[in-house]
Amino acid sequence: MFRNLAVIWKGAAGRKLNSLEVHDIMCYIGECVVVGGVRRTSLISLSNHSDERMRHAKMGNWHTENPQRSLANNSICFTDKPDMGAFMREWVSIYESRSGERGVFNREACKRMAPERRDTDHDFGCN
């Protein structure tokens, strides 16, 4: 893990890390979460519609060139309803990736639906 992180940090010397570099760091750390030889990592990366790096994170030969990315599910996070053209471009991108990534998550729809699915009598847990 440390060697992989060092490569990323050295490549970003003098600038901020980009979204894909941060995603890869998260995945490399996730590779270390193993108990009894079983991976115990569950990761999701939410990205903006305009983030081309994350859109293409699981395209091409990623499973051999960047196998750490298999640890995470990647989803686009809409904050409002996209226009039909933007939405269809994202579906085409999902098809062309051949990986089923990026998924689609709508933050506002989730906020509207959450009260119907939450028992407010509980005072524990997350989310």
Regions found by a protein language model. Give the residues of each.
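Conserved catalytic cores of very large enzyme subunits
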Residues: 1-127
